Amino acid sequence: TKSVLDFSIQLKEKPRIIFMSSYSLYGNSYTNSIKENWALKPVSSYALTKKSSEDILLKYSQVYGLKIIILRLASIYGEGLKKQLIFDSCEKISNNRNIFYGTGNEIRDWLHVSDLCALVYKVIKKNSKNNMIVNCGSGKGSKVKDIIEIVKKQFNSRIKIKYVNIKQKSPKVLITNIKLAKSFKWAPKINIKKGISEYIKWYKKINA
């Protein structure tokens, strides 16, 4: 991040800097949909790293006049992604493995990558002169166990899921408030069930 910023301040025409941050910065303190101006309370090393990057970006903006756009991404998923919960669920359930970490009651906000791309385009097109911080999510929460059950149904699996409840440095509930995102005349089009269905079609195709 710092290398990009150091290069940017040397340019005659200062570029806008777009940074993909994370809603994990909000931490464990909230159970309602989280607004961009709420206090940041990161608990994981990943979130702390994102927080550090945001601080550097905003400092450079203050000192050098760079225009900064910070996008705080929810849980992004979609065809091609080979990590995170949905991919992990496909891998385990298709191979009759049933162990998942956590309680299953953790709540996350899922946004399909195509909806994210549409929002990023809208934000860039606005060409605001001011710095912006925008939540990028669906505004809806889904329990981990419900996501896994959707995957199970897609695989016609009757496997019984077992949760190993270990202490993890990750928030229990993360749901974004997307009022600001919607002000760009944007709204998510792909709901979680449709998104997972399309994802599993892709997953089965690459594993055929």
What spans do the regions from the language model cover?
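Hydrophobic positions on the long internal alpha-helix
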Residues: S3-V4, S8, I56-L57, L119-V123
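Conserved sequence/active-site signature of Rossmann-fold short-chain dehydrogenase/reductase
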Residues: L25-Y26, I76-G78, L116
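Hydrophobic alpha-helix immediately C-terminal to the catalytic Tyr-X-X-X-Lys motif of short-chain
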Residues: S52-I56, Y60, S89, I147, ...
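Catalytic helix-loop patch of NAD(P)-dependent Rossmann-fold dehydrogenases
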Residues: K2, R16, S24-I70, L81-K82
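NAD(P)-cofactor binding segment of oxidoreductase domains
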Residues: T1-I17
